[in-house]
């Protein structure tokens, strides 16, 4: 599909617009602004990733993908490739709205009977039986192919680089992760993956 004249997108947990009001300086959240638009995100690193994409010719969809992927690196407990993605995209040229539901599916074998055999009467809050098959990455691919100006690999490059090189962990995230240590210790696989040896 040829590049759309303008795309304005809203992706869960990522908001983009082309007009920035003055930031309320009584709050501590950062805002990163570029000539081609603004990107708002919980993490300044994520906002910067989106801005870089805008500055190098990407559109709002590309920036949203880059921002969401970076959030998955710097705040994996809140966002990213292990979760769902929902998007409403407005194509200004055609005046049409497009919706994408990239929520994951429960595994085929995840039945009520299976859970009952495990002694569970309700959905567990932790562990392998508490999750679905992630849909975010497939959603990123579909959005990039249909509405993006860049390839998905280009949109993901900032987050891949950050994951490989490391990043400063904000105080709030460090506190959140520290508070999760006891929960991680209850699961041998999680403990061996996420806790220091």
Feature locations, PLM:
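Bacterial N-terminal signal peptides
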Residues: 6-18
């Amino acid at each position: 599909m040829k590049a759309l004249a303008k795309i304005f997108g809203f992706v869960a947990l990522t908001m983009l617009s082309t007009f920035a009001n003055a930031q309320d300086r009584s709050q501590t959240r950062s805002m990163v602004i570029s000539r081609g638009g603004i990107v708002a995100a919980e993490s300044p690193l994520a906002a910067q990733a989106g801005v870089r994409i805008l500055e190098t010719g990407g559109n709002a969809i590309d920036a949203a993908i880059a921002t969401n992927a970076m959030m998955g690196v710097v705040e994996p407990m809140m966002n990213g490739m292990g979760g769902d993605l929902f998007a409403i995209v407005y194509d200004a040229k055609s005046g049409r709205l497009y919706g994408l539901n990239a929520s994951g599916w429960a595994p085929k074998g995840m039945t009520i009977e299976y859970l009952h055999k495990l002694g569970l009467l309700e959905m567990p809050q932790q562990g392998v039986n508490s999750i679905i098959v992630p849909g975010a990455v497939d959603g990123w691919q579909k959005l990039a192919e249909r509405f993006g100006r860049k390839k998905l690999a280009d949109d993901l490059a900032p987050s891949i680089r950050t994951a490989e090189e490391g990043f400063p962990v904000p105080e709030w995230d460090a506190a959140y992760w520290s508070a999760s240590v006891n929960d991680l210790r209850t699961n041998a696989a999680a403990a061996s993956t996420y806790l220091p040896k």
